């Protein structure tokens, strides 16, 4: 049996195949790096995730300003905490997608629900752009009335109870807030 393949030396064919494989692998790595470092990559990922979530049977989330029929029970701390975290996350997602006004509404809701509003505002001042933070601050005056409408009489009953989420400013923020910060840092 001959050591040639189609007239080429077998070792040369193996060498050529190895070089072609390495070149293809380098090509893949180069374009993957270029794709990931593209300025609009993270926006495309967010849009793709939203499209998949929408196609997966999840109902689109309605803004709280439009009247949320499924307002959490203000006497249940776990529901309020879940609602608080949802408002923060939804607000940041909307702002990242370019919908600053609607995102500001949700973040203002979270700020008003938080027991330590000033500390939370200082966190948002550090993490949001100046325009986004200004939009949140402008939403704060109308947020109290909006939340009163959303929660109705239950808010009056729970007003004398301690806040559901507190951050005293000493040390790191609560784990839930830190998780949100870490999650959004991954997307930046």
UniProtKB/Swiss-Prot annotation:
Asked whether the keyword Lipoprotein is assigned, the reply is no
Q: What if the gene is knocked out?
A: RNAi-mediated knockdown results in impaired mitochondrial homeostasis with the up-regulation of the mitochondrial unfolded protein chaperone hsp-6 and impaired daf-28/insulin secretion.
Q: Does the keyword Transport apply?
A: yes
GO biological processes: intracellular protein transport; protein import into mitochondrial matrix; tRNA import into mitochondrion
Spell out the InterPro entries in the cross-references: MAS20 (IPR002056), MAS20_rcpt_metazoan (IPR022422), Tom20_dom_sf (IPR023392)
**Residues on Cytoplasmic side:** 32-188
Stretches that traverse the bilayer: 13-31
The organism's place on the tree of life at top rank: Eukaryota
Q: Give the start-end ranges of region Disordered.
A: 42-73, 156-188
GO terms for cellular component: mitochondrial outer membrane translocase complex
Q: How does it assemble?
A: Forms part of the preprotein translocase complex of the outer mitochondrial membrane (TOM complex).
NCBIfam families for the chain:
3a0801s04tom (TIGR00985)
UniProt function note: Central component of the receptor complex responsible for the recognition and translocation of cytosolically synthesized mitochondrial preproteins. Together with tomm-22 functions as the transit peptide receptor at the surface of the mitochondrion outer membrane and facilitates the movement of preproteins into the translocation pore.
Recorded hits in PANTHER family, A to Z, give:
MITOCHONDRIAL IMPORT RECEPTOR SUBUNIT TOM20, TRANSLOCASE OF OUTER MITOCHONDRIAL MEMBRANE 20
For this entry, the protein name equals Mitochondrial import receptor subunit TOM20 homolog
Question: What is the gene called?
Answer: tomm-20
